[in-house]
Curated annotation (Swiss-Prot):
Pfam families: GHMP_kinases_C, GHMP_kinases_N. PANTHER family: 4-DIPHOSPHOCYTIDYL-2-C-METHYL-D-ERYTHRITOL KINASE, CHLOROPLASTIC (PTHR43527:SF2). The lineage of its organism: Bacteria, Bacillati, Actinomycetota, Actinomycetes, Propionibacteriales. This is 4-diphosphocytidyl-2-C-methyl-D-erythritol kinase. Pathway: Isoprenoid biosynthesis; isopentenyl diphosphate biosynthesis via DXP pathway; isopentenyl diphosphate from 1-deoxy-D-xylulose 5-phosphate: step 3/6. GO terms for molecular function: 4-(cytidine 5'-diphospho)-2-C-methyl-D-erythritol kinase activity; ATP binding. It is an enzyme of class 2 (transferase). The active site is at K6, D136. Its EC number is 2.7.1.148. It catalyses: 4-CDP-2-C-methyl-D-erythritol + ATP = 4-CDP-2-C-methyl-D-erythritol 2-phosphate + ADP + H(+). GO terms for biological process: isopentenyl diphosphate biosynthetic process, methylerythritol 4-phosphate pathway; terpenoid biosynthetic process.
Amino acid sequence: MRAPAKVNLHLGVGAPREDGFHPLVTVYQAVGLYDDVTARAAPDWSVGVGLPDWMDDDAVPLNGANIVDRAADLLAAHHGVERTGELHIAKAIPVAGGMAGGSADAAAALVALDRLWGLDTSDDDLLALAARLGSDVPFALLGGTALGTGRGEVVTPVQDRGTWWWVVVPSDTGLSTPEVYRHFDRMFPDAPSQPVPADALLGAIAAGDTWALADALHNDLEAAAIDLRPELGRLIERGEEAGALRGLVSGSGPTCVFLCGSADHARSLAADLSGAGHPVVLAANGPVAGAHLVSYA
């Protein structure tokens, strides 16, 4: 199974609720960077991982600590079956980068194990299980472009008439999502209870208007991420000086994404940023499909 990375085209964050969670209004877009999860029958349970050269060997937790273990446990408990199988994760989505790579793995694992175990779980039940795993997991199942509300886990597909090109620059060190939210709370103690709506962004993508999209991109967590990691602000400035229509921190960071006008524009910007000393620079288009079958092993 293959599942995509996501970028947040809009991320409005409200003040924390009594339960500690922040209400969100976000627009997700699935982009063409993928993790692959392969599931094979086996008498016991095991999870392995393959990483590209630019990822640290310890970037993905194993030994029962991976989100795919929790996905398997939830699916098995839902149907009253035993957790068995051999899963292998081939990573390509930046880890701890604000692009929901772990959520993509969980979504792919749910679909792969549902097929492996012959369960035929309904789409509604898969989405409910996904929401229990994390706010980004339901979207990784759906893909495309979608509006997320609540904690981001209530996902509604939206009209998107564009094909958008992005340059993605991951960081060699992660940035803790909880710490970014805590820093947001410190920086903005008077944040409104209701998040900034996404009307301008939704209008831009419905019209397929690249310049309107560039103007409408919004991330309330960007200031907190840049305050914690000032080099992210310098990277965004560098990308925009090199011709990006707009750059921003993806989600809670530290990955930065840059909107480009075409595939050629994206390749040119990627080459420029790579030449400026960034060791990993990726180009990707969106929107793309959510978790889907690639082949049976």
